[in-house]
Amino acid sequence: MQGTLSVWLAKRGLIHRSLGFDYQGIETLQIKPEDWHSIAVILYVYGYNYLRSQCAYDVAPGGLLASVYHLTRIEYGVNQAEEVCIKVFMHRSNPRIPSVFWVWKSTDFQERESYDMLGITYDSHPRLKRILMPESWIGWPLRKDYIAPNFYEIQDAY
């Protein structure tokens, strides 16, 4: 079953895949990494002007990584805002997708956190560097195949 946004995108020849609806009735779409930036701009112009959240997760050990965007279409005089969830899957061997920082500025820290924890590179992000872990940290702590170091060093605890 396709939602209204999926039908709208299909009428305009924009490649995507409908993943159905979540428990709240929010439509979920899958977009290819190479199509993500252009579709993000189209969604912004269409009215999805608010990025509610961006996160990322490891689908399975040795499998794909996913970057997830929750967008809201806010219009004056409308009681119920439209929402959509966009998922962009990529191979862990080269996890790269275009940054949408220049579309929604609020992705700044969120894309940096996804980079820091999972190693997803967001091309054209202006400040893509670690935000939670020290710059010297090796590896991506939220990947399911991550092997945690067996030492803990507490510095300046008091």
From Swiss-Prot:
The keyword RNA-binding does not apply. It is an enzyme of class 7 (translocase). One of its GO terms (cellular component) is chloroplast thylakoid membrane. It is found in: Plastid, Chloroplast thylakoid membrane. Keywords: Chloroplast, Membrane, NAD, NADP, Plastid, Plastoquinone, Quinone, Thylakoid, Translocase, Transport. GO terms for molecular function: NADH dehydrogenase (ubiquinone) activity; quinone binding. The keyword Protein transport does not apply. Pfam families: Complex1_30kDa. It is a peripheral membrane protein. One of its GO terms (biological process) is photosynthesis, light reaction. It catalyses: a plastoquinone + NADH + (n+1) H(+)(in) = a plastoquinol + NAD(+) + n H(+)(out); a plastoquinone + NADPH + (n+1) H(+)(in) = a plastoquinol + NADP(+) + n H(+)(out). Its EC number is 7.1.1.-. SUPFAM superfamilies: Nqo5-like (SSF143243). NDH shuttles electrons from NAD(P)H:plastoquinone, via FMN and iron-sulfur (Fe-S) centers, to quinones in the photosynthetic chain and possibly in a chloroplast respiratory chain. The immediate electron acceptor for the enzyme in this species is believed to be plastoquinone. Couples the redox reaction to proton translocation, and thus conserves the redox energy in a proton gradient. Belongs to the complex I 30 kDa subunit family. NDH is composed of at least 16 different subunits, 5 of which are encoded in the nucleus. This is NAD(P)H-quinone oxidoreductase subunit J, chloroplastic. It comes from Arabis hirsuta (Hairy rock-cress).
